[in-house]
Amino acid sequence: TGIQLLLGYSDVFGEPAPNLIEEIGKINMHKTLSIIAELIGIRNVKLNPIRSFYCEISIPFEMAIKKEILGIDERLVNGLPSNPVYRKDWHIISLQMFLIFLKKILIYGDYSTLSKTDYSITKEDYAQIIRLQLVVADKVEEKNKAEFDEGHFLYSTYHLNNQPSVAGRILRMYYMLGNLCKDKTNFAADVQGEYRDYPAAFLEKYGVSITQYMAFLLWELQPYDSSNNRLNYFSVWRNIKAIYKSSVNCDLLLKTLSSLSAKPEDLHEWAVHTENEEWNFEGFQRAPFLLDGKGNYLSISDYTLSNAFFEKLYWLIRDCYSTEDSRAMAFYGRLYERYIQDLTREAAQTTYTYIDEFLIGKRGHEAKSSDAYLQKENKLLAVEAKGFSVLSKV
């Protein structure tokens, strides 16, 4: 809670920063992608709580990284750090800065090192990647000082910090596509003409059902919910066959992975074109997994992975239909409206009177009312379902 400050290289070290592009050209891309993904994954992790005087104190794991990995001087006073860099709301690990750094890797990195997978990861490797991410933060600050774009700033702040419940996304999509969409008689006669069997179209195009798709994503989200509060010191790239070889539906899972993956070189052109758009992570949202071409895959972040439950799924469904079919997703909005109506009806219970959508206006010029209403005595609450995306096709 409160304002959180992202630190730059100059804030932490107070000395000239290394040349970012030159340093990127020297490092092993395969190793760097692994470290970036791992550091993003532990950005919100806490150390084991300290118990003192009948209370528990939670300390961000980031504090240990400041001390043990970067070796930042604590300047102890009465046993407590006086260096402001150790404040809990001053951060050296940032989702946005690491994703920007990842774009820089795709632009300026040495792609020949993607095949060099026989490496170890040391404390200095972690320190180097964090330092370069801090250089990125300085570069962003310099750019904003010269030319600050309020729209881009609000855009990125909203999308990165708005974190809807993943469980809510899963349940919503399952209810809409796994329940309501099964039978067009769930809808009024005037809506049935817009009906599309999205689950059948999805299965035909991708070879997996929407339910199987969501089950795969749930499995891949598990590592982000673990209690692991330490660095691995090994690659977090995972071998596809080793992970899924014992699965009954291995082939189906691999099909799901292929619809959500890209090789780093496939994202190069997008990264170049959007280098100056600090808010644009569309490429990572289209492909939340990276493939190294040697049978290994890497989840970029929990942020990009959770997006696959909603916005990414929407566009996968859209791709099941011709681009000329302008009404392909009209029924998708009807599904969302019905979902909101059912939620509102359930919320009414015995305390409120539920009123469904109805026609208003003169005969021949009718319009539909809001999607649902809740009434209690002489008070009326109107409920109108509106969905939107702050990015384009992700």
Q: Where do the PLM segments sit?
A:
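Acidic, metal-dependent phosphodiester-chemistry machinery of nucleic-acid enzymes
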Residues: T1-R334, R338, D342-E346, T350
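Catalytic core segments in nucleotide and nucleic-acid processing enzymes
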Residues: W315-V394
